[in-house]
């Protein structure tokens, strides 16, 4: 299915989406993307509907053809301080701040958002499967976050982040019980806060 713009006009329409909200470890990432009005690509869809190979194929296309794009990151420590919902909004704000110019309309994937500098915004549940700019943002947020978890995995291979990317898989939760938490775990998250102490050999 070919995705569309939210409104067919001349306003600079910016799609925003986050990745990593439900993870036990690692930062939350967000992306903000402004696409040309005539942008189209047959593979473009919600990142969750694409294979890893398709996401990484699309990323350079989005980056090269977008009018502007930005990435925002919020650390696990910040997430623990302000909660994951506010952290997701903050990541989107930081992504928008990275854009080369101010958008005129924000499209937010989801049902809530903290307004940014009085720019009109529209919250759309499932927007990443309906609108091009949100789908593009979902792909950038997902791939950049996956890259960050692969880097973190080099120092903490026991948690299997190269496979689970920080999500609460059975193997990840088992590793937390066995090895304890890392500096990259979200200490206020269920599944981390109730983990057992490390086993002693």
Curated annotation (Swiss-Prot):
Nucleotide-binding recorded as keyword: no
Protein name stated in the entry: Ribonuclease HII
Single GO term (MF): manganese ion binding
UniProt catalytic activity: Endonucleolytic cleavage to 5'-phosphomonoester
UniProt xrefs under InterPro entries: RNase_HII, RNase_HII/HIII, RNase_HII/HIII_dom, RNaseH-like_sf, RNaseH_sf
EC nos: 3.1.26.4
GO cellular-component term (any): cytoplasm
Gene: rnhB
Binding note for cofactor: Manganese or magnesium. Binds 1 divalent metal ion per monomer in the absence of substrate. May bind a second metal ion after substrate binding.
Record's function text: Endonuclease that specifically degrades the RNA of RNA-DNA hybrids.
Protein family per UniProt: Belongs to the RNase HII family.
Localization terms from the record: Cytoplasm
Biological process per Gene Ontology, one example term: mismatch repair
Pfam family membership, one: RNase_HII
Keywords: Cytoplasm, Endonuclease, Hydrolase, Manganese, Metal-binding, Nuclease
Major localization listed first in the record, in broad terms: cytoplasm
Signal peptide: none
Binding site for a divalent metal cation: 17-18, 109
Domain RNase H type-2 per the UniProt entry, residue ranges: 11-201
SUPFAM superfamilies listed in its UniProt record: Ribonuclease H-like
Enzyme class name: hydrolase
């Amino acid at each position: 299915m070919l995705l569309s713009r939210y409104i067919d006009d001349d306003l600079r329409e910016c799609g925003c989406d986050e990745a990593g909200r439900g993870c036990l470890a690692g930062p939350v990432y967000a992306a903000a993307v402004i696409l040309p009005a005539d942008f189209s690509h047959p593979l473009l869809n919600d990142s969750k509907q694409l294979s890893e190979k398709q996401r990484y194929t699309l990323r350079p296309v989005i980056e090269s053809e977008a009018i502007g794009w930005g990435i925002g990151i919020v650390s696990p420590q910040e997430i623990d301080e302000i909660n994951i919902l506010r952290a997701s909004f903050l990541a989107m704000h930081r992504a928008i701040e990275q854009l080369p110019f101010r958008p005129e309309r924000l499209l937010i994937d989801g049902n809530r958002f903290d307004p940014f500098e009085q720019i009109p915004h529209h919250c759309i549940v499932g927007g990443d499967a309906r609108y091009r700019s949100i789908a593009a943002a979902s792909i950038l947020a997902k791939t950049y976050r996956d890259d960050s978890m692969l880097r973190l995995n080099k120092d903490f291979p026991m948690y299997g982040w190269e496979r689970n990317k920080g999500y609460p898989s059975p193997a990840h939760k088992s590793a937390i019980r066995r090895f304890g938490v890392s500096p990259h775990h979200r200490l206020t998250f269920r599944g981390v806060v109730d983990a057992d102490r490390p086993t002693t050999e």
